[in-house]
């Protein structure tokens, strides 16, 4: 019999097939992006609210079906499926209430009839989600949230690291599009999240990609050249070639080719450029770009996008410290999890602010959400332990969106990354806001890397990547005059207009569509023909 572990991440899904008798991982399948339109969790939530939770649920479930097909097994032999993710992803997966996550105000929730929403642990038949004929002998395990806004993924990053047992002030961050984080001071825990955006994982930048084979994940200096480091088919780091980042001259290739760059590669490139004097102030680059391989470049626009992500994380870290009442120098441990937390050079991350440069010890982990799901697959009784621990964690949640401290920090970060504001001016601005100056970066810290890759074991069947999920959303456009302005305006080539049975239809690739943060197609239409609230799923 088999078990399946599933991580519903904001930037993509990860799943593993496990032999329940031998406890061996047999195969790993990942997607190269989230199936819902948008680049962050709030985009996904907005899509579900606007278009309908049933549609969002259907897109997610169809994506999971397509991932499970990659296992090439008789799915009736799957006995257990454990699913982990943030509250929004897990609610959409289960097709349960999400409006409490969309509307923070109690009056608004009461007006909508939203009351006493609980996100407790659940064990239920897979037929409730997938129907009677699919996973017919399987039960689904969903771990609990700590609070409605502190989900199973946040619980996982606390459980799968040493975070909860540390007596000294400690910070844990799951580096991803939504950047979940928690600060522990004695028995007190403060949680938060920073909507860093997709650039932190390599999306939304010109040559960017999620961590996968061929992705540049790191760079190292060798004289005037940079050694490009890529991920191989087993997701291990491998030296590729030397390149002059200004001229693009390549030499000394080891045979590994790069096809794009991850967010961790971008962080390393920025750190190298600063050390080597190629960057004096952001976002300016020599000749307007850094060349990392044939067709692989970092532009000044990419610097701005990545800087917004790094800046959001640094601002959130500093906000947690300031609001908690401790000093920067009190922070003992910083735990880094997720793909970006695993692959990034922690020293580079410290120098740029993606990791707290004032923490005395940094420990790097991998995908803690998938790790917890795997534990629940292998040992169902582990859920009882998780529930008990979740009950004991009394966490306060700090909303960055309404925090004046965060807003002030982030304004300074934006000025630093997008306008080249000097650090001296940054400190002057902080003084005006009544905030402490930027923390000093410690020169001698302990960095411990406990994993070599995001997912330690991909299994004997290897890693399968679902690059194109292939889910299409359609809506009739009766007033369409076939000018195709919407198609030309779409920055991701996610849209096409077709005629079928005498009717014009707008077809969206759900994975490519930028969702709420874009909607250029709606704005540019001269006939106001596109009603995104009526989108429905169809096959590609």
Swiss-Prot record:
Function: Reductase required for the activation of corrinoid-dependent methylamine methyltransferase reactions during methanogenesis. Mediates the ATP-dependent reduction of corrinoid proteins from the inactive cobalt(II) state to the active cobalt(I) state. Acts on the corrinoid proteins involved in methanogenesis from monomethylamine (MMA), dimethylamine (DMA) and trimethylamine (TMA), namely MtmC, MtbC and MttC, respectively.
Residues the record lists as binding [4Fe-4S] cluster 1: 480, 483, 486, 525
Co-factor remark: Binds 2 [4Fe-4S] clusters.
This protein's UniProt keywords: 4Fe-4S, Iron, Iron-sulfur, Metal-binding, Methanogenesis, Oxidoreductase
Cofactors, names only: [4Fe-4S] cluster
PROSITE patterns for this protein: 4FE4S_FER_1, 4FE4S_FER_2
Name the record gives this protein: [Co(II) methylated amine-specific corrinoid protein] reductase
Reactions performed catalytically: 2 Co(II)-[methylamine-specific corrinoid protein] + AH2 + ATP + H2O = 2 Co(I)-[methylamine-specific corrinoid protein] + A + ADP + phosphate + 3 H(+); 2 Co(II)-[dimethylamine-specific corrinoid protein] + AH2 + ATP + H2O = 2 Co(I)-[dimethylamine-specific corrinoid protein] + A + ADP + phosphate + 3 H(+); 2 Co(II)-[trimethylamine-specific corrinoid protein] + AH2 + ATP + H2O = 2 Co(I)-[trimethylamine-specific corrinoid protein] + A + ADP + phosphate + 3 H(+)
Species whose genome carries this gene: Methanosarcina barkeri
Subunit structure: Monomer.
Domain of life: Archaea
Binding site for [4Fe-4S] cluster 2: 490, 513, 518, 521
Gene3D superfamilies per record: 3.30.70.20, Domain of unknown function (DUF4445) (3.30.420.480)
Gene Ontology MF: a single term: oxidoreductase activity
GO biological process, any: methanogenesis
Catalytic class of the enzyme: oxidoreductase
PANTHER family reported for this sequence: IRON-SULFUR CLUSTER PROTEIN (PTHR42895:SF2), IRON-SULFUR CLUSTER-BINDING PROTEIN-RELATED (PTHR42895)
Residues covered by the 4Fe-4S ferredoxin-type domain: 471-500, 504-535
């Amino acid at each position: 019999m088999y078990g399946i572990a599933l991580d519903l991440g904001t930037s993509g899904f990860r799943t593993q097939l496990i032999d329940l008798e031998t406890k061996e991982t047999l195969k790993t399948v990942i997607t190269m992006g989230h199936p819902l339109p948008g680049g962050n969790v709030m985009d996904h939530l907005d899509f579900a609210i606007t278009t309908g939770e049933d549609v969002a649920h259907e897109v997610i479930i169809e994506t999971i079906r397509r991932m499970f097909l990659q296992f090439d097994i008789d799915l009736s032999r799957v006995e257990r499926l454990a699913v982990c993710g943030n509250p929004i992803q897990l609610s959409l997966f289960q097709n349960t209430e999400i409006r409490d996550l969309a509307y923070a105000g109690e009056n608004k929730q009461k007006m909508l009839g939203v009351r006493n929403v609980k996100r407790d642990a659940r064990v239920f038949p897979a037929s409730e989600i997938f129907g009677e004929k699919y996973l017919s002998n399987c039960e689904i395990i969903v771990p609990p949230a700590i609070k409605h806004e502190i989900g199973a993924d946040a619980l996982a990053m606390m459980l799968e690291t040493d975070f909860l047992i540390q007596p000294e002030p400690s910070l844990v961050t799951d580096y991803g599009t939504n950047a979940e984080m928690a600060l522990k001071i004695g028995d007190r825990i403060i949680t938060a999240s920073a909507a860093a955006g997709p650039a932190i994982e390599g999306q939304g930048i010109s040559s960017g990609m999620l961590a996968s084979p061929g992705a540049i994940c790191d760079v190292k200096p060798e004289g005037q050249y940079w050694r490009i480091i890529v991920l191989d088919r087993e997701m291990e780091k491998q030296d590729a070639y030397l390149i002059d980042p200004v001229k693009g001259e390549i030499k000394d290739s080891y045979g590994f080719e790069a096809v794009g760059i991850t967010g961790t590669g971008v962080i390393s490139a920025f750190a190298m450029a600063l050390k080597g004097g190629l960057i004096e102030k952001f976002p300016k680059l020599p000749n307007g770009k850094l060349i990392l391989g044939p067709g692989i470049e970092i532009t000044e626009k990419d610097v701005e996008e990545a800087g917004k992500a790094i800046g959001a994380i640094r601002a959130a870290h500093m906000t947690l410290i300031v609001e908690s009442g401790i000093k920067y120098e009190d922070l003992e441990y910083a735990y880094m999890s997720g793909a970006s937390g695993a692959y990034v050079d922690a020293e580079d991350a410290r120098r740029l602010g993606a990791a707290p440069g004032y923490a005395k010890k940094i420990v790097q982990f991998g995908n803690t959400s998938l790790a917890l799901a795997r534990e629940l697959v292998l040992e169902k009784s582990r859920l009882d332990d998780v529930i008990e621990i979740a009950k004991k964690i009394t966490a306060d949640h700090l909303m960055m969106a309404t925090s004046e401290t965060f807003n002030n920090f982030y304004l300074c970060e934006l000025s630093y990354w997008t306008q080249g504001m000097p650090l001296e001016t940054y400190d002057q601005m902080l003084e005006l806001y009544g905030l402490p100056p930027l923390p000093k970066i410690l020169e001698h810290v302990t960095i411990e890397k406990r994993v070599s890759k995001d997912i330690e074991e991909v299994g004997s069947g290897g890693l399968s990547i679902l690059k194109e999920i292939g889910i299409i959303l359609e809506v009739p456009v009766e007033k369409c005059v076939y000018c195709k302005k919407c198609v030309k305006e779409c920055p991701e080539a996610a849209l096409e207009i077709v005629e079928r049975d005498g009717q014009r239809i707008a077809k969206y690739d759900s994975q490519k569509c930028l969702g709420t943060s874009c909607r250029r197609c709606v704005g540019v239409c001269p006939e106001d023909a596109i009603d995104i609230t009526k989108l429905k799923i169809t096959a590609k």
